[in-house]
Curated annotation (Swiss-Prot):
Expressed by the venom gland. This is U1-lycotoxin-Ls1f. Residues 21-41 form a propeptide. InterPro entries: Spider_toxin_CSTX_knottin (IPR019553), Spider_toxin_CSTX_Knottin_CS (IPR011142). GO terms for cellular component: extracellular region. Residues 1-20 form the signal peptide. It comes from the Eukaryota. It comes from Lycosa singoriensis. It is found in: Secreted. GO terms for molecular function: toxin activity. Its main location: secreted. Keywords: Disulfide bond, Knottin, Secreted, Signal, Toxin.
Amino acid sequence: MMKVLVVVALLVTLISYSSSEGIDDLEADELLSLMANEQTRKECIPKHHECTSNKHGCCRGNFFKYKCQCTTVVTQDGEQTERCFCGTPPHHKAAELVVGFGKKFFG
């Protein structure tokens, strides 16, 4: 009976040690992932800034990610160029307005 208790205690110790190592590895992976997300967040393009060269790099707003909105600009020479900026599309503005009113009325 004593041998069984010793073996069970040994198994419990080994399992807890191996699971704690796994948890440490998982925490390290999560930390690296969070650091990568923070780096990506720092590299995103803020609202009203130019996104002509990186049309998918706009930052997130309060509720939605900003969209790269482009227009054609004609220079004084008559040359047409495309200029883009990060902004909130009209349907996202409407949704944010509705959510804002909902928060005011319902707390």
